[in-house]
């Protein structure tokens, strides 16, 4: 299935997944799309879009130079009690991060962008850690705002914010 958009195509994942807000099923949808893209296409960037995304200009390869790496990373003791951390910290991926003294990272999922190597690392990590993946997809919190981003940060892979989500508007007018 395709959506035509100015002579280019957006490819939709062929199997519909019923997702819920504030639930790991959103992360599962991103994971499935990422796996599908990796298995079927050559690409440079994987962009997570939602109905909340707004682009102010045309996005094309010449705009990639404006992508700004998200470098948010904090250890457990640096996280605030606010946001969704109290719930998220009980998940298996958080326990893994804590147990291995790794970093937490976060960003709005609307417009979060991963390069090809980051996608490979995310999928490899989740496919090797089945119990984390299953728990992640079933967790009742907004896992899409931190899980994949944290995997990137801890595997020295960049991720970018190009969307108009919370606190990610720093380069939106360049895109």
Residue ranges and their predicted role:
Residues 2-44, 48-49:
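Active-site-proximal specificity loops/subdomain of glycosyltransferases
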Residues 17-18, 53-55, 119, 165-168:
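Short, solvent-exposed loop/turn segments at secondary-structure junctions
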Residues 23-31, 53, 141-149:
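Conserved glycosyltransferase catalytic-site signature
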Residues 54-136, 141, 145:
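Conserved catalytic core of nucleotide-sugar-dependent glycosyltransferases
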């Amino acid at each position: 299935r395709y959506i035509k958009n100015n002579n280019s195509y957006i490819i939709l994942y062929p199997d519909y997944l019923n997702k819920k807000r504030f639930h790991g099923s959103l992360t599962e949808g991103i994971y499935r799309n990422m796996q599908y893209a990796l298995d079927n296409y050559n690409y440079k960037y994987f962009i997570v879009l939602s109905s909340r995304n707004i682009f102010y200009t045309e996005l094309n390869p010449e705009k990639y130079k404006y992508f700004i790496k998200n470098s948010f990373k904090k250890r457990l003791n640096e996280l605030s009690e606010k946001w969704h951390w109290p719930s998220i910290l009980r998940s298996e991926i958080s326990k893994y991060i804590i147990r291995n003294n790794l970093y937490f990272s976060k960003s709005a999922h609307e417009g979060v962008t991963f390069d090809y190597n980051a996608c490979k690392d995310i999928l490899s990590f989740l496919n090797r850690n089945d119990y984390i993946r299953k728990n992640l997809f079933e967790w009742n919190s907004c896992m899409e705002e931190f899980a994949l981003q944290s995997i990137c940060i801890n595997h020295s892979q960049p991720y970018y914010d190009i969307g108009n989500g919370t606190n990610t508007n720093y380069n939106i007018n360049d895109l």
